[in-house]
Amino acid sequence: MMGCLPFFSVETWILLLTFICFFVIYSNRPYGIFEKLGIPGPKPYIYWGTVGRHHKVYYEDDVQSAKKYGKVWGTYEFRTPVLAVTDPEMLKTILVKECFTYFTNRRNFHLNGELYDAVSIAEDDEWRRIRNILTPSFTSGRIKEMFSVMKNISGKLTASMRSKAHNNEVIAVKDIFGPYSIDVMASCAFSLDVDSINNPSSPIIDHASKLFRFPVPVLILQGFFPILLPLFERLGVTMFSKTSTDFFKNVLEKIREERSGSSNPGDVLQNMINSQTKGNDSYSHKPNHKRLTDHEILSQAIMFMFAGYETSTTTLVFLAYNLATNPEVMKRLQEEIDSTFPDKGAVRYEALMQMEYLDCVVNESLRLYPPAARLDRIAKETVKICGITIQKDMVVMIPVYALQRDPELWPEPEEFRPDRFSKQNKQSIKPYAYMPFGVGPRNCLGMRFAQVMVKLALVDILQNYSFSVCEETEIPLEMDYKGFVGPLNPIKLKLETR
Ligand SMILES: *[C@@H]1O[C@H](CO)[C@@H](O)[C@H](O)[C@H]1NC(C)=O
Ligand SMILES: *[C@@H]1O[C@H](CO)[C@@H](O)[C@H](O)[C@H]1NC(C)=O
Ligand SMILES: *[C@@H]1O[C@H](CO)[C@@H](O)[C@H](O)[C@H]1NC(C)=O
Ligand SMILES: *[C@@H]1O[C@H](CO)[C@@H](O)[C@H](O)[C@H]1NC(C)=O
């Protein structure tokens, strides 16, 4: 017998068998926890868990699971037990009532590289301190101050569309909205004039879109062997692209150097820097309750770019798609635009924010396509909520995409119907059925900012142009299975001059 296996010594065999034993024993450990708790859900495969059981697109998978298992179910993301919840009473408790006590933190993959202290990743007191300092940068007063900057960029956007409409070009809508988002974010965050609308090859777009493209092998490896996370971390493995993070770090450091003293633009970066001098009672590299360290400022600024770019862009892309495929909605919206700003007049902030139908259209588009398909929280302690025990350290996941397409909450959920949000119908929307920006103290900080920049671009464009479907338009859309909610292939439409 041993003669057939000449290459392996006894020691090698022992090692190999030990490894196989470890592999098998380790594999089964996390599974069965939901069965014990009496929570339904798909049966896991070892190591792989229940990933992609019903559909390869993870958020479509959530829709199928919700149909099958109801409002609470258990899944295993590779080896990690994840409790999915769409029950409104539980959502209220998790996201709002017990946010500060049991559910303060998001799931942390620990491979955050430089961004470990970004507000979306920071935990507990750290998070609360950073969030409190950032909040004033996103009040409606501050956003109103940024409006003229946004308008300038939106003006460039519409100007760049003129020739495209004139030549009857087929456009990949992301190619126009991506540069718009980048330019708005860079201007409002750092007063940086990128003008990527007119210089589409600018490296900043490339880096901004790269950051959230998590490397799949790392995702799978950390999923299979979460106990190796500290090792990966020490080896410098990160989910966020290091070249892209470094790119923004250099840009920002240069801006800060140039901005010594005299100039004081009202951008997000300056608001953070100003908070440093306000809380001036010890060294600036030491955190205190009133201010951010230099590193923290850097992380917030980078996170703002990255979190804002992709989400605002896809929101605009889906709006264009929904309007092109629902021309009667677009017509009604254009009527509202024309009566609010007669004779293609300049868009004003207050009037824009008061447009009712526009708000319904944007909300309905975000209902069907919320950029973040899932939210999550970690339970700090074992806690019983609405009769369901949630164990310490368990991931609670809110499948927003599935929630917002739940046929019990949204009749004919696949239909694009802005009137769901009209004054008359709004009352029938159940609380906690709609959360494209999350809810509670840990909701999206940039919500109002995003709403303004999205509405402005949409109104400016629809004043002079209409979107229309063409042969190249994919209907229905095939969805992307990586990252944020998005189309697998670029959405292509045509522009018509009004
Ligand atoms: C935007 O602002 C720049 C100066 O900051 C100006 O030259 C340009 O004409 C403006 N563009 C639009 C479309 O308002
Ligand atoms: C802190 O305040 C002192 C005076 O009280 C001032 O000299 C110093 O420049 C301030 N430091 C910072 C970082 O603003
Ligand atoms: C649209 O959604 C936002 C938040 O997502 C909300 O504040 C607003 O009231 C909604 N508008 C309507 C008309 O429902
Ligand atoms: C829309 O068209 C009118 C003339 O038809 C023009 O004056 C205006 O600048 C255009 N607006 C935009 C945002 O392109």
Segments (PLM) and residue ranges:
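C-terminal helix/juxtamembrane-tail motif
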Residues: 1-6, 274, 483-498
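N-terminal membrane-proximal hinge/A-helix region immediately C-terminal to the signal-anchor transmembrane segment
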Residues: 3-117, 123-129, 151-159, 244, ...
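Classical protein tyrosine phosphatase
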Residues: 41, 84-86, 92-94, 192-195, ...
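Conserved cytochrome P450 K-helix E-x-x-R motif and the immediately C-terminal K′/meander segment
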Residues: 50-70, 250, 254, 347-386, ...
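Cytochrome P450 heme-thiolate "Cys pocket" and heme-binding signature region
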Residues: 302, 307, 386, 423-454, ...
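Cytochrome P450 heme-binding "Cys pocket" and the immediately downstream C-terminal segment
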Residues: 327-329, 447-484
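Conserved cytochrome P450 K-helix/beta-meander segment immediately N-terminal to the heme-binding cysteine loop
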Residues: 398-425
